[in-house]
Amino acid sequence: MNKIEMKSNKFKNVISDVNEKLHNYKWEESYKIIINALSENPDAPEPHNLLGLWNEFNKNYDLARKHYRAAYALDPTYKPASINLERVCTMFSSRNVPADFGEVFEKSTKDNTNLKNYNKEKEMKNNDGQ
């Protein structure tokens, strides 16, 4: 196992642990885990996203936005940060969007075949209707 895989597995464990603690309202325990993860790797978006969630759940929305922005700035492809940032910055329309803990791990290469096929079918229908 290389260093990147080890780091990825470690963050999966941290995310899972913090997720469980936040859902059980264990604020101090979750905060300590997040700060520890942040101090070990300040350039990773995951701890900033989790700290944003922690602040949001504690109704400190300004600090939550700052950490979501930090996570997004560190890795613009990290979707949980952009989802959470959009939700917390949008006044009304995104309030029903659930918090994204980053617990769903995506593959780095995405298969857009279904989307391409859908777009082709849609385009063909539009051309037939004209």
Feature annotation, model-predicted:
Residues 1-13, 39, 95-96, 100:
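TPR-adjacent "capping" and linker segments in tetratricopeptide-repeat scaffold/adaptor proteins
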Residues 10-11, 45-46, 79-80:
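Helix-start (N-cap) detector for alpha-helical repeat units in TPR-like alpha-solenoids
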